[in-house]
A protein has these predicted regions:
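Conserved short alpha-helical segments that host acidic/polar catalytic motifs at enzyme active sites
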Residues: 1-241
Length: 241
């Protein structure tokens, strides 16, 4: 569709074709998301997880396809290395091969569409890597690694993981907290410098809430089991299975 001559095909965007997640998005106020999508008003609609993103765009004009969350992630922060990341992905396209697509793999290019935000660009690469057989947590660790090079107490196996994957993918670096989910995993990863807040609450009633600050979701004090925060370079992960 993108490469067709259909009128206004540049505005065509599929939020998701996933069988495990549904994405609701829009350029609207947070309190309007429920009334806008009628199925969110149905009492029979239930979910075991939710990933919510609320903010105003700062480095791109607000458009529907750039509204977060994206297909696999959202972001609070910015990727300072974006120009280099995009350039390297374009270079990689020259050597990419696929048993599935064969000689038609060039129809996937460019992997990162021009004119997209840092968050949208990162999500496109995450989507590509999910089709290589890697798990979503592994992909996030590849793209946002810990400060591992001079870490004296890190295990050799963990350092080897980062060293190996560093040959495949350079870091997407910057002050950012990046929540992600594929329906089976849900979690968040904080940049190696810890420059964005990420705090979590575990309740006695069996809920787990993570957000940029405490208090986004009301929790009775007597229901709080544990409070905590995500440390620099660390991942917060829940296996829903």
């Amino acid at each position: 569709i993108r490469k067709s001559k259909i009128s206004e095909s540049n505005y065509f965007y599929i939020p998701s074709l996933s069988i495990t997640t549904i994405i609701y998005k829009g350029i609207i106020m947070p309190e309007d998301i429920g009334p806008y999508y009628k199925d969110l008003q149905e009492i029979d609609l239930v979910t075991r997880l939710a990933l919510v993103h609320q903010r105003f765009s700062t480095n791109t004009m607000p458009t529907w396809e750039l509204a977060q969350p994206f297909r696999h992630m959202c972001q609070n922060g910015e990727i300072n290395t974006l120009r280099g990341n995009v350039s390297r992905m374009r270079v990689r396209e020259e050597i990419m091969k696929s048993d599935v697509f064969g000689p038609q793999i060039d129809k996937l290019f460019p992997i990162i569409l021009p004119g997209k935000s840092d968050s949208a660009s990162m999500d496109m690469v995450v989507e590509l890597l999910t089709h290589t057989g890697r798990s979503l947590p592994e992909i996030m660790m590849m793209m946002i690694p810990e400060a591992w090079e001079k870490h004296k107490t890190m295990s050799k196996e963990r350092k080897a993981f980062y060293e190996y994957n560093g040959c495949i993918m350079e870091p997407w670096d910057g002050p950012a907290s990046v929540p992600f989910t594929d329906g089976d995993y849900i979690g968040a990863l904080l940049d190696r410098n810890g420059l964005r807040p990420s705090r979590y609450t575990v309740t006695k009633s069996g809920k787990l809430i993570m957000s940029s600050e405490i208090g986004v979701v009301d929790v009775a004090p007597e229901d709080v089991k544990e409070h905590g925060r995500l440390e620099p370079g660390k991942m917060f992960l829940v296996d829903m299975n």
